[in-house]
Design a protein with these regions (language model features):
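C-terminal motif of bacterial Sec signal peptides marking the signal peptidase cleavage site
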Residues: 1-3
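Immediate post-signal-peptide N-terminus of mature secreted/exported proteins
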Residues: 6-66
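C-terminal amphipathic alpha-helix
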Residues: 18-39, 104-150
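Extended amphipathic alpha-helical scaffold segments
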Residues: 49, 72-75, 99-102
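Short N-proximal segments of mature Sec-exported proteins
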Residues: 54, 61, 68-81
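Short helix-adjacent coil turns
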Residues: 58-62, 86, 112-113, 117
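Short, charged, amphipathic alpha-helical segments
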Residues: 65-72, 88-97, 116-124
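Short, solvent-exposed, charged loop/turn and helix-capping segments
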Residues: 76-92, 109
Length: 150
C-alpha cells in the first residue's frame, strides 16, 4: 500500500529514463587482419558480427528494436551453421554468452529500461568470441582444420 502513495513524479521518472545511453556505450571493434578469416570460414557469424556493430549507431528506438530482432535471428542462424572446425565447447559457450546478453538487451529495451551495460557486455562477448576463434586457429596449425566445410 505504501507504493501506491508515492507521488506520480517518482513513479514516472523511472519510465522516462533513456533506453540507450549512447555516450556510455562502447563501439564494437573492427576485425583485425588475424580475424578476417572468419568472413570466409564462417559467413553466418561474420554477418552477425558485422550487423552487431550498428547497435551503437541506431538512429532511433524503432531501428534499434528492429536491429535487435535481426541479430537474434542471425545469431540463431550462426549457431545452426556452425562449421565442423568450430564444433568446440569454447565456441558454443561464447555464443551462448552472446545470446544471453542479446536477449537481456532485448528484454530490458522492451521494458523501457536502460540497456547500456548490457550492450557493453554484448560487445565484450563478441570480442571474446573473436579472440577465441583466433586462439583456436593458432592452437591448430593444421591448415586443413580451417578449410571451409563443403
Amino acid at each position: 500500500m505504501t507504493a501506491c502513495q508515492r507521488p506520480v513524479s517518482q513513479v514516472s521518472s523511472a519510465t522516462n529514463a533513456p533506453k540507450v545511453l549512447w555516450d556510455s556505450v562502447n563501439e564494437l571493434s573492427k576485425l583485425d587482419t588475424s580475424q578476417v578469416m572468419i568472413k570466409d570460414l564462417w559467413p553466418a557469424y561474420f554477418s552477425f558480427r558485422e550487423r552487431s556493430a550498428y547497435l551503437s549507431k541506431a538512429p532511433s528506438d524503432e531501428e534499434f528494436n528492429l536491429l535487435l530482432d535481426e541479430l537474434i535471428e542471425k545469431q540463431s542462424v550462426a549457431m545452426t551453421e556452425l562449421p565442423n572446425w568450430a564444433q568446440q565447447p569454447s565456441i558454443r559457450a561464447r555464443m551462448k554468452v552472446v545470446y544471453t546478453y542479446l536477449n537481456q538487451t532485448k528484454s530490458l529495451f522492451g521494458l523501457n529500461q536502460p540497456v547500456h551495460s548490457e550492450l557493453n557486455a554484448l560487445f565484450m562477448g563478441i570480442k571474446d568470441m573473436d579472440q577465441t576463434l583466433v586462439l583456436l586457429r593458432n592452437q591448430n596449425n593444421d591448415s586443413l582444420l580451417f578449410v571451409q566445410d563443403t
